[in-house]
Amino acid sequence: MGFPKVERLLINYKTLDEFKKFKGCGAQELSMLEELQANIIENDSESPFYGIYYGGSLIARMSLYMKRNGGEPFEITGTYLELYKLEVLPTFQKQGFGQMLVNYAKQLQFPIKTIARIQSSGFWDKLSFQPVSVTDGDFYIWHPETNSNAITNEESA
């Protein structure tokens, strides 16, 4: 068995069965089962769902959506990612699988917005996300480090 890696999940009946394992493990707001059922098209490769398989079973998952212009008070302009419903099965928690999912999103090099749920603020703090409080709730933002060696269009010949 190879080292687990993050992969885009196909929207199909196998994934639907895998999602059922998460039902009852977490809070209702983390449930993706209904979202998957509503969008089921066999083997849709444009799925917003990403996960980690271990031993042939899905053990961790998240939703990742590309958005534009977070505006005030989000401190995000342009394209950014919304990371939702990150969940790791209880048996596999505290083994780095949640961090693997977040690092996968980070390597795309877009700002990331997420909502900390179920006493997870320490997790997001550890991964260099910054808390932002607004009147309708709290969330966390991560900004990619800017590469000072990058050449912009204005600087190129």
Curated annotation (Swiss-Prot):
Concerning Gene3D superfamilies, the annotation shows: 3.40.630.30
Residues forming the N-acetyltransferase domain are 9-154
Family matches, as InterPro entries: Acyl_CoA_acyltransferase, GNAT_dom, YlbP
Question: What is the E.C. number?
Answer: 2.3.1.-
Which EC class does it fall in?
A: transferase
Q: Which HAMAP family match?
A: Acetyltransf_YlbP
Q: What name does this protein carry?
A: Uncharacterized N-acetyltransferase BcerKBAB4_3748
Q: Which organism is it from?
A: Bacillus mycoides (strain KBAB4)
